[in-house]
Amino acid sequence: MIYENSFLLETSDLIADDDAILLSNNRNEFFSFSANTGALNWQQKINSNIRPTLIENLIFTVTIEGFLVVIDNKTGNIIRITNVFDKIKKNKRSKIKPVGFIVGTKNIYLTTDNGLLILIDISSGRSSSILKVDNEKISRPFILNKNLFIIKDNSIIKLN
């Protein structure tokens, strides 16, 4: 009998600062490696395959299940975990996957694979509003000249 365990590994983009290289994957692993030696600084059990964001000493990431996780970059300690899918009906949550996010001064802007743009209050970590942009996957948001842009299919959506 031959047993095969096929598993598609999806990793986040790498991000780095002067001391560490950070990445996560969909196998419940989030890593910090030394930028100088390549040695493991710390590891956490966080299930995310989207690009994390590093601001000063804080790492922001969103799990595949829809939890915003804030981590201390030096120690790897989890500072806060909040459910950002809390305003979405429970029976629909498992069908929604985060695509990407950006961190603004007051909000985190999270896009999903079913066309939602979720605004998350940065101080509380809770979703403050949800906008339906499309019925299908939309891109990770980006900001240019104080405007938010999202790509969907063959078009670019500009939000003020």
Language-model segment annotations:
Residues 23-25, 31-34:
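Structural recognition of beta-strand segments within beta-rich domains
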Residues 27, 65, 114, 153-154:
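Surface-exposed loop/turn positions within WD40 beta-propeller blades
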Residues 31-32, 69, 118, 157-158:
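WD40 beta-propeller blade core
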Residues 34-37, 73-76, 121-125, 160:
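Short loop/turn segments that connect beta-strands within beta-propeller blades
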Residues 54-55, 61-71, 77, 81-120:
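Loop/turn-rich, solvent-exposed surfaces of beta-rich toroidal or solenoidal domains
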